[in-house]
C-alpha cells in the first residue's frame, strides 16, 4: 500500500513537472487546485481587494478582469485564465500616491484644456472684431474721401459764384449746402469717435488676452514642474499576487490587468511600443486592443 502511494506520488510529481514546463502559469495555482483539476491548464485568479476610492465594486473589477483575459483568448484562440473565488493568485487594487498623482494630473490637464479653449474662443472673437474694425475703417476712409470731394465741389461753386454773381442769384442754395456739409462733417466725426472708441476697447481686450496668455503659459510651466515625467509601475505581478496601483479609465485598467496576466503566463516585456507587453501603457489602443505579433511571439517562445 505504501509502495502504491509512493508510486502515485512520483507519477503526480512527474506529471505536474511536465505540465508546469508546458504551461508555466500552472505554478501559480494552489496544489489543491492542481490535484482537483489535473487536466485544467488555466491559471486561476480572484479579486481580493478593491480600495473604495477607485469607485469600482469587486463585481465591476471582476467583469473588467474577464475582459482582460478575453484579450488573450481572442488573440491566441486559447483559454488561459479562469476566475475562481478560492484561487491562490489574488488581485489587489491599491490606492496610493500613484493614483492620487494620476488623478491630480488629469484634473490639471482638464483645467489647462478648458483655459486653452477659453483663450482660443476669446482670440477668435477678437479676430472677428478686428476684421469688423478694418471694414469700418475702409468705410470711413471712403466716406471721408467723398465728403472732401463734396467740400471741394462746394468751394469751387462758391468761387464760381463770386466770379459770376449773375449765374448764382439764389443765396439760399449755398446756405443749405453749407448746413448739409456741416451736418455730414459732424456725422462723420461721430462715426470716427465711435471707431476710435472701438479701437480703444479692442486694445484693452488684446491686453486682457495677452494677460490670459501669460497666465496660461505660467499654468503650463507649473504643470510641467509639478508633474515631471517619471516612470512608475501601474501594476505589479510578484508571483503570488497582482497589484494594480494606477489607471486612468476602465479601458486602461483592462489593459493593465491583461499586461500583468501576461507576466503570469511567464512573458517578459516586448520592444514594440504598441504591444500589450510593452512596459509603458501609452501607444496602445486601450479601447479596442488586439494582441500584436510581438505579444504572440513572446508567448510562443516562453
Residue ranges of each PLM-predicted region?
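Zinc-dependent metalloendopeptidases
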Residues: 1-302
Amino acid at each position: 500500500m505504501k509502495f502504491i502511494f509512493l508510486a502515485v506520488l512520483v507519477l503526480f510529481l512527474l506529471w505536474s513537472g511536465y505540465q508546469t514546463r508546458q504551461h508555466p502559469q500552472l505554478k501559480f495555482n494552489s496544489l489543491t487546485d492542481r490535484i482537483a483539476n489535473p487536466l485544467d491548464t488555466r491559471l486561476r485568479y480572484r479579486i481580493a481587494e478593491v480600495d473604495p476610492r477607485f469607485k469600482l465594486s469587486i463585481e465591476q473589477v471582476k467583469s473588467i478582469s474577464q475582459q482582460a483575459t478575453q484579450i488573450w483568448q481572442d488573440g491566441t484562440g486559447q483559454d488561459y485564465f479562469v476566475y475562481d473565488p478560492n484561487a491562490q493568485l489574488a488581485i489587489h487594487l491599491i490606492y496610493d500616491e500613484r493614483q492620487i498623482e494620476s488623478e491630480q494630473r488629469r484634473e490639471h490637464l482638464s483645467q489647462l484644456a478648458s483655459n486653452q479653449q477659453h483663450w482660443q474662443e476669446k482670440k477668435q472673437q477678437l479676430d472677428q472684431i478686428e476684421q469688423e474694425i478694418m471694414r469700418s475703417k475702409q468705410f470711413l476712409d471712403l466716406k471721408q474721401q467723398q465728403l472732401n470731394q463734396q467740400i471741394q465741389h462746394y468751394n469751387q461753386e462758391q468761387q464760381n459764384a463770386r466770379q459770376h454773381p449773375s449765374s448764382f442769384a439764389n443765396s439760399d442754395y449755398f446756405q443749405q449746402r453749407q448746413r448739409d456739409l456741416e451736418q455730414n462733417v459732424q456725422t462723420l466725426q461721430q462715426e470716427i469717435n465711435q471707431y476710435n472708441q472701438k479701437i480703444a476697447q479692442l486694445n484693452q481686450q488684446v491686453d486682457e488676452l495677452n494677460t490670459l496668455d501669460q497666465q496660461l503659459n505660467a499654468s503650463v510651466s507649473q504643470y510641467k514642474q509639478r508633474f515631471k515625467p517619471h516612470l512608475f509601475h501601474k501594476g505589479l505581478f510578484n508571483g503570488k499576487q497582482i497589484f494594480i496601483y494606477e489607471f486612468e479609465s476602465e479601458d486602461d485598467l483592462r489593459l493593465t490587468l491583461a499586461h500583468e496576466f501576461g507576466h503570469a503566463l511567464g512573458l517578459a516585456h516586448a520592444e514594440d511600443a504598441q504591444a500589450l507587453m510593452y512596459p509603458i501603457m501609452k501607444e496602445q489602443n486601450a479601447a479596442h486592443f488586439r494582441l500584436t505579433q510581438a505579444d504572440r511571439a513572446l508567448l510562443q517562445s516562453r
